[in-house]
Amino acid sequence: MLSRDQHCFTFAKRFSFLVCIRIVNMIVVKVGGSDGIDYDAVCADLAERWQAGEKLILVHGGSGETNRVAEALGHPPKFVTSPSGYTSRFTDRQTLEIFEMVYCGKMNKGLVERLQRLGVNAVGLSGLDGRIFEGKHKDSVRSVENGKVKVLRGDHTGTVEKVNTGLIELLLGAGYLPVLTPPAASYEGVAINVDGDRAAAQLAAALRAEALLLLSNVPGLLRDYPDEASLIREIPANDVESYLEFAQDRMKKKVLGAAEAVAGGVGRVVFGDARAGKPISAALAGEGTVVS
């Protein structure tokens, strides 16, 4: 009988044999899309660890570049804040098309190219491909504007509720490094904008990852943002949500994603700094905020 960490799959039609791989010590790395991130440093560190035999998956964002492209195309971004205090991008159809152009195109292929130059056979995919990420399409969103709650319709967003790991496991088993990005697929097959941190958390849980690294342009969760000296070093796994009070802006989604990841069985989550050095190695060494 196969252990819980073994995954077997058949390469049908072209190949008639069964291939079994053992995925252990999986590391899911999510790198954000805000200004200041050193993607060259992230890719160099990732390549070094991959070539040393570690199993990694890279998930990425692209918010900063999406904002710039949207402005240049005359369709500036619109952000909404929910009654519970979470900020997200309002995604009408035109915004979704810009989002896909940047996330699936410029950002994804830019990272794949960096990794290929470093000798890593990376494959870039969105969560829409193979329905890797699936969730319910949310057509409307509640937004607080001038102290009043409004309902905005025509939104193309959702939350990842299901991760289909078969394609990812096939790629890993064949020696490829997956580079993933939103959007996800709705249950009706429509592209939906989803939060990348929470998608990465769901992916890490589905793969029973040893670690989920959430890398951004800050050193971790700060008790007194933006004072980097106020870095919170450790968060107990059973008390993550109580630290939401210290999270500002998009960090709220990272904390929420961390809570979901550890609840789903991920060994540890680290909020790390992607601005320089060896971001992945530093996070794995405990630099940043460690949730365990």
Swiss-Prot record:
It is an enzyme of class 2 (transferase). The record marks 30, 254 as: Transition state stabilizer. It comes from the Bacteria. GO terms for biological process: L-arginine biosynthetic process; lysine biosynthetic process via aminoadipic acid. One of its GO terms (molecular function) is ATP binding. It is found in: Cytoplasm. Keywords: Amino-acid biosynthesis, ATP-binding, Cytoplasm, Kinase, Lysine biosynthesis, Nucleotide-binding, Transferase. It catalyses: [amino-group carrier protein]-C-terminal-N-(1,4-dicarboxybutan-1-yl)-L-glutamine + ATP = [amino-group carrier protein]-C-terminal-N-(1-carboxy-5-phosphooxy-5-oxopentan-1-yl)-L-glutamine + ADP. Its EC number is 2.7.2.17. One of its GO terms (cellular component) is cytoplasm. Substrate binds at residues 89, 193. Pfam families: AA_kinase. Pathway: Amino-acid biosynthesis; L-lysine biosynthesis via AAA pathway; L-lysine from L-alpha-aminoadipate (Thermus route): step 2/5. Catalyzes the phosphorylation of LysW-gamma-alpha-aminoadipate. PANTHER family: [LYSW]-AMINOADIPATE KINASE, N-ACETYLGLUTAMATE SYNTHASE. Belongs to the acetylglutamate kinase family. LysZ subfamily. This is [LysW]-aminoadipate kinase. It comes from Deinococcus radiodurans (strain ATCC 13939 / DSM 20539 / JCM 16871 / CCUG 27074 / LMG 4051 / NBRC 15346 / NCIMB 9279 / VKM B-1422 / R1).
